[in-house]
Amino acid sequence: MSLVENISTVEDVSAVDIESDEYKKQFLHEATMLAIESVEKGWGGPFGAVIVRDGKVIGRGQNRVLLTGIPVYHAEVTAIIDACSRINSKALLGSDYYEGNLEMIPRPAGSPDPVPERAQMLKGCDLYVNGAPCPMCMSAIYWARIDRVYFGTRLEDTSKIGFDDEFQYIDFRLPWKERKAIQCFPDFERNYALKACEAWQNKKDRHPY
């Protein structure tokens, strides 16, 4: 049985202070239980995450790198995918995707803008993760427009057990050509690559994000 099956979330949040630390603790605890489950089942590293909106969990994720063989399947990323799949139009998730489906995506109430805010669907959400996010996950959190992040352990804590997230943050501060982990070659065929930027800029019906 999944460890998280024993964790209950209050269904009626009207009678509780959802902004209190005492209430929020349950979400960090659940993220930690998800992390432990991932370790015990051999799915991936010791990381779990939950996404909360208005005091309720709308998405859960675990590190599943070992299970899938996909190196980007970190807890925060899988939680974002889970949350978006729950609040998004299911038509967007299948092979029958077509441009008209964009009309089905929610947008601000009363907005005269016919273009849905497709890439901002996790605005108003909080993410809880048992460990400090790595640079990739932090970027995903930015792109998902999540408002707040709560995490338990520090980068130095996970560094001690073999995860080099701290080194990545240090490396990212260096200029492109001085980075140590990966060789970077900026401006390679830049003028040709700019054609894609021009195509986007010239597309009159583009969906901004």
Report each predicted region and the residues it spans:
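Short His-Asn-centered micro-motif
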Residues: 128-132
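Zinc-dependent deaminase
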Residues: 1-40, 98-123, 133-209
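Internal, charge-rich low-complexity segments
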Residues: 81-103
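Short beta-strand scaffold segments in enzyme catalytic cores
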Residues: 46-55
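A short helix-loop-beta-strand connector motif used in the catalytic cores of GNAT acetyltransferases and
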Residues: 41-45
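A short, polar/charged loop-to-alpha-helix boundary motif
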Residues: 64-78
